[in-house]
């Protein structure tokens, strides 16, 4: 399966791949200069002692509060060439509702089991039908959202490093977003159906939150980082009252 594509005048292929596979790879959204600039912006932002920073033995491997410490990160969705495609998928008036940052520092790699992204960040917990499992992460209330909402959302993973087998790529099950009522399929997933996402710095992996995915360990001895900006997008006026997004940057 070829999930790599880029088009500036027509997004027919991207729409087809998103519908069929739940994902596609958008090549070269950022050039080398832009990648370097965003790495610098991230490094400066992460000098803060914000509660959303995730560290292990002094190495930062993530941030749950990217919109708080680096507000202009929303420009990656708003001002670059991918904006037109997002408008076509989500409709005008959409917003960035959560921003995360992930790294796999050399000698501090990590892995995640197979899962789907089902939680959303809200302003406050509320008793609304089908919104469950209230939690608080980095001081931000979260809920598990119903399938109907997650099906309308979109995730951008902007890669600031080249990713290959050496530095712990994402692995996905193409098409799994279409059978996401529960996660029973993850225990019996065929290895032949699993696709590792290898990409260049500046590429963007576009996916539906309900696409099943895992994250592999980096290889021992690697000197490579795997720095990724993760932005979650949602249409306007989609949350039922009284729920509100913790952030909605349009």
What are the language-model segments listed below?
Residues 1-21, 27-136:
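Non-heme Fe(II)-dependent double-stranded beta-helix
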Residues 22-23, 202:
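Catalytic palm active-site di-aspartate
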Residues 25-28, 95-98, 155, 169-172, ...:
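A structural signal for short, well-ordered beta-strand segments and their strand-loop junctions
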Residues 30-32, 101-104, 119, 162-165, ...:
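Short, solvent-exposed loop/turn segments at secondary-structure junctions
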Residues 48, 170-172, 177-195, 201-206, ...:
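Non-heme Fe(II)/2-oxoglutarate
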Residues 98-100, 156-158, 229-233:
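A structural signal for short, well-ordered beta-strand segments
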Residues 108-198, 240-246:
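Catalytic core of non-heme Fe(II) oxygenases with the double-stranded beta-helix
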């Amino acid at each position: 399966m070829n999930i790599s594509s880029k088009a500036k005048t027509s997004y027919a292929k991207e729409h087809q791949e998103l519908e069929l596979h739940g994902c596609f790879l958008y090549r070269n959204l950022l050039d080398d200069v832009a990648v370097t600039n965003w790495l610098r912006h991230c490094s400066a932002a992460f000098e803060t002692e914000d509660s959303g920073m995730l560290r292990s033995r002094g190495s930062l491997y993530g941030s749950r509060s990217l919109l708080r410490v680096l507000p202009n990160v929303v420009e990656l969705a708003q001002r670059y060439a991918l904006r037109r495609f997002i408008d076509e998928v989500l409709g005008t008036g959409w917003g960035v509702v959560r921003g995360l940052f992930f790294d796999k520092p050399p000698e501090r790699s990590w892995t995640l089991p197979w899962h789907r992204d089902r939680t959303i960040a809200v302003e406050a917990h509320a008793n609304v039908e089908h919104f469950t499992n209230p939690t608080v992460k980095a001081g931000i209330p979260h809920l598990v959202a119903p399938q109907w909402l997650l099906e309308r959302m979109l995730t951008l993973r902007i890669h600031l490093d080249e990713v290959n087998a050496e530095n712990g790529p994402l692995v996905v099950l193409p098409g799994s977003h279409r059978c996401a009522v529960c996660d029973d399929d993850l225990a019996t997933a065929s290895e032949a159906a699993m696709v590792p996402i290898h990409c260049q710095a500046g590429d963007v992996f576009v996916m539906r939150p309900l696409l099943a995915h895992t994250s592999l360990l980096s290889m021992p001895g690697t000197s490579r980082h795997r720095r990724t900006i993760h932005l979650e997008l949602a249409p306007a006026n989609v949350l039922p009252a009284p729920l509100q997004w913790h952030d909605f940057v349009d």
